[in-house]
UniProtKB/Swiss-Prot annotation:
SUPFAM superfamilies: Phosphoenolpyruvate/pyruvate domain. Its EC number is 4.1.1.31. This is Phosphoenolpyruvate carboxylase 2. Signal peptide: none annotated.
Length: 960
């Protein structure tokens, strides 16, 4: 039997370019893994894995459904323990393939940097947002002056908002092992490596591959919001904390190269971080006020700890004695007031001599940081602390003041190069992360605020707020906001829900205001939604009220958003309150689920244009907050392209974007990834402001308006109006079983009963991604384009022109093309054959015909013969992955069949995988099956199913 290694080389015969080592990396990791598999579980299982791979590769070659049946008969003959080992093996091999890709991409980038040569890369020149290249392009091609660039850069802000959306399907224990495999692989191919080093690295590589394979991939309990927050914060520890100053230094260098001899000021807010973990209550009952308080204190403790761990390095560096009189006086004062040794410090524990004034001052900063950390720790553990608040840092200004004093003094004494060393990095960290590491956003559904208001008005006996008209609500809210009297006392009758809203606001009042960012209202529709939150914040005595951000998601809400925001701006009280700044959030996932991708993308585009117009009329600076998912169905896609395809004037130097679940790992999992992410966001935001994309021509708009209606009708006629669609969806995908994956702390439905409306956008997309049919992404496109071309043949050339000249349209089409390249209707047909009742088969066939028709139209408009012909690298990477995914799909479909149909009989062959310990060889299957004793299905089926879900998610790389 040909080894997988040989098969790989057959599958991808030609290198894409000289520096293409992907197949080599992939083959090395697989060889190592298969040897480990054989050592642990015996030769038979290795052969079974190879046989499955071979059948899949044959299927991928000709797409002959018979090959899938052959594959199915191999897979269904495995007993419980064996099918777990096979599922785990394929899932593991896909993870290894992803790692090989990441190392290859990093390698090609490095080569490209060394050659500084041409960019015939998957991210052709338009997408490569290297900050230096962007500066040079702006100066050379667009005639901007270096000063203009510096000025725009200093005043722009990108705020990355980490959300714990339940799409990160890999456990943290595994992510760390993956990181080490990546490092070993990269070092193994370094040029100057000695034979001994090579041998040791190879051993380390095998060790990590085995450790990852021997780790249970399945989360046995759902994570709590605190777990999610700790997982999110671990990226700060590992990459972001050090990555930010490193990135800002690169910006300084790039500025120098275009002739600016200044550094980016440390108080320029280039990059900010926020978080929803522990603040996002929308549909997640597990996020309680208690959780919000814990998460804030934990983040403060982590921030103080990170600063504390660096302050001694700074004390070592600043050993100078020349300083300004002001600093000398401060140092003397501190020196005389503290006369004790500090034995709990490792360095500088003795009394610091007065002739080292910077160290004296930093010593005091260190004491305060120590107290700040300990106070947060005690508050977290016991709810109280014996450290007085005035011995800690409570505001950013307090913390910055002594550091700025040192910086100014060094510069005044001619030691600017020293000031611009570690001290500048430290100042930039302080300015970026503050005392709270990230600012926590609070998100709540608008109905919950309405319930609270209703309880208040009923209690005051002035009627039912719920039944009032919008006008009456506004009038009452404004009269209360202009007045001074408290609205309610402790005698307000409260349900659990109402108490939850009010207790959350009390937490906001109790904790320092720099812990928090925005208060986001989901499903917002009218000005009263915003005013109600303003009033509640005042009633709960939030000293510095959070800015209130309406979130518009559904198609109808997006269309009505500009008018709602205009009404809000026309209220004098509100206009005075916001001080000329407003943030509006637009949701990509729910709009896509509601109307389909094409109409949602166009509605989001138009809503932004109109919102910016409204803000201009009222003299308000608008920040758009983009709630994008990681998948295309939920608005995902390459960062820089997404930003550069936004309508002109909508970015305007300030941008907020959610970074979710698995996207956090792809963007910040490694130092070089973190660096690249920060570059991309900064460069694309700058470029969008200084060189905005073109506005679409009136005839393009008219055409899109017309066909978007057709797309929505087609999408809704199937998803919402087809009477048996929900039944078909639940049968043809693993949607019902998705909840068992324990990915996130949030339930997968808004309301337990009900159809597609109540299903969250994430499981909706996840389920279709599993069967490689991706219905939500493409449904509607074919009908829309077909209608346009049928109506007038000339429309084809109009659409082609739109594709070639208009970034927004091009990005929309390219992303759908990429999803088609990952899709496979033959696999979806297998699920139908096994799982769907026969009278629904014609419906599935109709959808698959739609898939093919839409694919053809997309290729026509893009002017491509084959999918992804403009992107050979991505095409090669997808081809390498397909054969692994196919085995997992077949295994998933047959496992679902066994779970759902008790009468489905399969002929099992004898158990083949051996366990290493011979003493247990009489009950080896039992070992693996025992991991999940509470499963309601036959032994091993649930674990096999979850492993296939995780494997396919790893292969598709855009889970939810």
């Amino acid at each position: 039997m040909a080894s997988i290694d040989a098969q790989l080389r057959l599958l991808v015969p030609a290198k894409v370019s000289e520096d293409d080592k992907l197949v080599e990396y992939d083959a090395l990791l697989l060889d190592r893994f298969l040897d480990i598999l054989q050592d642990l579980h015996g030769e038979d299982i290795r052969e079974t894995v190879q046989e499955c791979y071979e059948r899949s590769a044959e299927y991928e070659g000709k797409h002959d459904p018979k090959k899938l049946d052959e594959l199915g008969s191999v897979l269904t003959s495995l007993d419980a323990g064996d099918s777990i080992v096979v599922a785990k093996s394929f899932s593991h091999m896909l993870n290894l393939a992803n790692l090989a890709e990441e190392v290859q991409i990093a390698y090609r980038r490095r080569i490209k940097k060394l050659k500084k040569g041409d960019l015939s890369d998957e991210n052709s020149a338009t997408t490569e947002s290297d900050i230096e290249e962007t500066f040079k392009r702006l100066v050379a091609e667009l005639g901007k002056s270096p000063e203009e660039i510096f000025d725009a850069l200093k005043n722009q802000t990108v705020d990355l908002v980490f959300t714990a959306h339940p799409t990160q399907s890999v456990r943290r224990s595994l992510l760390q092992k993956h990181g080490r495999i990546r490092n070993c692989l990269a070092q193994l191919y370094a040029k100057d490596i000695t034979p001994d080093d090579k041998q040791e690295l190879d051993e380390a590589l095998q060790r990590e591959i085995q450790a990852a394979f021997r780790t249970d991939e399945i989360r046995r309990t759902p994570p709590t919001p605190q777990d999610e927050m700790r997982a999110g914060m671990s990226y700060f520890h590992e990459t972001i904390w050090k990555g930010v100053p490193k990135f800002l230094r690169r910006v300084d260098t790039a500025l120098k190269n275009i002739g600016i001899n200044e550094r980016v000021p440390y108080n320029a807010p280039l990059i900010q971080f926020s978080s929803w973990m522990g603040g996002d209550r929308d549909g997640n009952p597990r996020v309680t006020p208690e959780v919000t308080r814990d998460v804030c204190l934990l983040a403060r403790m982590m921030a103080a700890n990170l600063y504390f761990s660096q302050i001694e390095d700074l004390m070592f560096e600043l050993s100078m004695w020349r300083c300004t009189d002001e600093l000398r006086a401060r140092a003397d004062e501190l020196h005389s007031s503290s006369r004790r040794d500090a034995k709990h410090y490792i360095e500088f524990w003795k009394h610091i001599p007065p002739n080292e004034p910077y160290r004296v001052i930093l010593g005091d900063v260190r004491d305060k940081l120590y107290n700040t950390r300990e106070r947060s720790r005690q508050m977290l553990s016991h709810g109280v602390s014996d450290i007085p608040e005035d011995a800690t840092y409570t505001s950013l200004e307090q913390f910055l003041e002594p550091l700025e004093l040192c910086y100014g003094s060094l510069c005044a004494c001619g030691d600017r190069p020293i000031a611009d060393g570690t001290l500048l990095d430290f100042l930039r960290q302080v300015f970026t992360f503050g005392l709270s590491l990230v600012r926590l956003d609070i998100r709540q559904e608008s109905d919950r605020h309405t319930d609270v208001m209703d309880a208040i008005t009923q209690h005051l006996e002035i009627g039912s707020y719920k039944e009032w008209s919008e006008e009456k609500r506004q009038e009452w809210l404004l009269s209360e906001l202009s007045g001074k009297r408290p609205l309610f006392g402790s005698d307000l009758p409260q349900t659990e829900e109402i108490a939850d809203v009010l207790d959350t606001l009390h937490v906001l009042a109790e904790l320092p205001s720099d812990c928090f960012g925005a208060y986001i209202i989901s499903m917002a529709t009218s000005p009263s939604d915003v005013l109600a939150v303003e009033l509640l914040q005042r009633e709960c005595r939030v000293k510095q009220p959070l800015r209130v951000v309406p979130l518009f998601e559904k198609l109808a809400d997006l269309e009505a958003a500009p008018a709602a925001v205009a009404r809000l701006f026309s209220i004098d009280w509100y206009k005075n309150r916001i001080n000329g700044k407003q943030e509006v959030m637009i949701g990509y996932s729910d709009s896509g689920k509601d109307a389909g991708r094409l109409s949602a993308a166009w509605a989001l585009y138009k809503a932004q244009e109109e919102l910016v117009q409204v803000a201009k009329e009222y003299g308000v600076k608008l920040t758009m907050f983009h709630g994008r998912g990681g998948t295309v169905g939920r608005g995902g896609g390459p960062t820089h392209l997404a930003i550069l395809s936004q309508p002109p004037e909508t970015v305007n130097g300030s941008l907020r974007v959610t970074v979710q679940g698995e996207v956090i790992e792809q963007s910040f999992g490694e130092e070089h990834l973190c660096f690249r992410t920060l570059q991309r966001f900064t460069a694309a935001t700058l470029e969008h402001g200084m060189h905005p994309p073109i506005s679409p021509k009136p005839e393009w708009r008219a055409l899109l308006d017309e066909i978007a209606v057709v797309a929505t009708e087609k999408y809704r006629s199937i998803v919402f109006k087809e009477p048996r669609f929900v039944e078909y969806f639940r049968l043809a995908t693993p949607e019902l079983e998705y909840g068992r994956m324990n990915i996130g702390s949030r339930p997968s439905k808004r309301k337990p009963s009900g159809g597609i409306e109540s299903l969250r956008a994430i499981p909706w997309i996840f389920a279709w991604t599993q069967t490689r049919f991706h219905l939500p992404v493409w449904l509607g496109f074919g009908a829309a384009f077909g209608y346009a071309i049928q109506k007038d043949v000339k429309n084809l050339s109009v659409l082609q022109k739109m594709y070639n000249e208009w970034p927004f349209f091009r990005v929309t089409i390219d992303l759908v093309e990429m999803v088609f390249a990952k899709g496979d209707p033959g696999i979806a047909a297998l699920y139908d054959k096994l799982l769907v009742s026969e009278e629904l088969w014609p419906f599935g066939e109709r959808l698959r015909a739609d898939f093919e028709e839409t694919k053809g139209l997309i290729l026509k408009i893009a002017g491509h013969k084959d999918l992804l012909e403009g992107d050979p690298y991505l095409r090669q990477r997808l081809r390498l992955r397909d054969s692994y995914i196919t085995t997992l799909n077949a295994l998933q479909a047959y496992t679902l069949k066994r779970i759902r149909d008790p009468n489905y009989n399969v002929q099992l062959r004898p158990h083949i995988s051996k366990e290493y310990m011979d003493s247990t060889s009489n009950k080896p299957a039992a070992e693996l099956v025992k991991l999940n004793p509470s499963s309601e299905y036959a032994p091993g089926l649930e674990d096999t199913l979850i492993l296939t879900m995780k494997g396919i998610a790893a292969g598709m790389q855009n889970t939810g």
